[in-house]
Amino acid sequence: MTAQLIDGKSIAASLRQQIAQRVAERRQQGLRTPGLAVILVGSDPASQVYVSHKRKDCEEVGFLSQAYDLPSETTQEALTDLIDRLNDDPAIDGVLLQLPLPEHLDASKLLERIRPDKDVDGFHPYNVGRLAQRIPLLRPCTPKGIMTLLESTGADLYGMDAVVVGASNIVGRPMAMELLLAGCTVTVTHRFTKDLAGHVGRADLVVVAAGKPGLVKGEWIKEGAIVIDVGINRQEDGKLVGDVVYETALPRAGWITPVPGGVGPMTRACLLENTLYAAETLHA
């Protein structure tokens, strides 16, 4: 058996097309264009690439895109003032603060400064709390995108044993809550987990988001399991690889996401989807 690929690029392109169509309809109805402000502090190369992709996505679907590229020495006070201005700007539906930030800045305080109804990344404690209470509003983009990928497989998630490898605030923890909402029995593993291979081997669904290349071995995967690899790691030869050993997981899994071209495109598409939702529902 060889796993079927979950094509994140194709699914994300379809979602962007739907969003672009809705933006065009809004214009025809005389409604304003959804607006996204993206703040980049410093010159981290990976962040610059991510931000350029997000701005290109905005142009593709017809969003208003405002870019704020700030020097690495930008102060906490200056960033707070900028966020406050964007919070009060009626043309802006979403405010995105690109992480990581320079060490002298308090990311938690800045993320909490973004108004919850403009927190299109879904990182604000209010939005995470809504998800935990089973009444999600703006959902964290990567877990939300993964749920869309899972829907594309047609798999019935109810009653599945799901394992989330990695307990980060951005992916692991909200992912576990999304899977609980979908009816899975969820185990979250982390750096103190004693028998990672055993947990993975019992799982019908594995979501790996640890940022460690090759952490999950293909032979650990249960026959026919769904494997979602969130990791994206650049090797010395420049090749991008995930947290799962893809070549050995492929013959065992039922469905698997490639790296690149799996989860990443969906994260970006869900950022657009959240921004459109904010414009149409929260700022109507």
From Swiss-Prot:
Q: Which reaction does it catalyse?
A: (6R)-5,10-methylene-5,6,7,8-tetrahydrofolate + NADP(+) = (6R)-5,10-methenyltetrahydrofolate + NADPH; (6R)-5,10-methenyltetrahydrofolate + H2O = (6R)-10-formyltetrahydrofolate + H(+)
Give the UniProt record's GO annotations in the biological process aspect: L-histidine biosynthetic process; methionine biosynthetic process; purine nucleotide biosynthetic process; tetrahydrofolate interconversion
Q: Which InterPro entries match?
A: Aminoacid_DH-like_N_sf (IPR046346), NAD(P)-bd_dom_sf (IPR036291), THF_DH/CycHdrlase (IPR000672), THF_DH/CycHdrlase_cat_dom (IPR020630), THF_DH/CycHdrlase_NAD-bd_dom (IPR020631)
EC code: 1.5.1.5, 3.5.4.9
User: What Gene3D superfamilies does this protein's entry cite?
Assistant: Leucine Dehydrogenase, chain A, domain 1, NAD(P)-binding Rossmann-like Domain
Cellular component GO terms, alphabetical: cytosol
Highest rank taxon of the organism: Bacteria
What Gene Ontology molecular-function terms does this entry list?
Answer: methenyltetrahydrofolate cyclohydrolase activity; methylenetetrahydrofolate dehydrogenase (NADP+) activity
Pathway(s) served: One-carbon metabolism; tetrahydrofolate interconversion
**Which Pfam families does the protein's record reference?**
THF_DHG_CYH, THF_DHG_CYH_C
Which residues does NADP(+) bind? 166-168, 232
Annotated keywords: Amino-acid biosynthesis, Histidine biosynthesis, Hydrolase, Methionine biosynthesis, Multifunctional enzyme, NADP, One-carbon metabolism, Oxidoreductase, Purine biosynthesis
The UniProt similarity line reads:
Belongs to the tetrahydrofolate dehydrogenase/cyclohydrolase family.
Q: What does this protein do?
A: Catalyzes the oxidation of 5,10-methylenetetrahydrofolate to 5,10-methenyltetrahydrofolate and then the hydrolysis of 5,10-methenyltetrahydrofolate to 10-formyltetrahydrofolate.
Q: How does it assemble?
A: Homodimer.
Instruction: Kindly provide the name given to this protein in its UniProt entry.
Output: Bifunctional protein FolD
Q: Which organism is it from?
A: Pseudomonas fluorescens (strain Pf0-1)
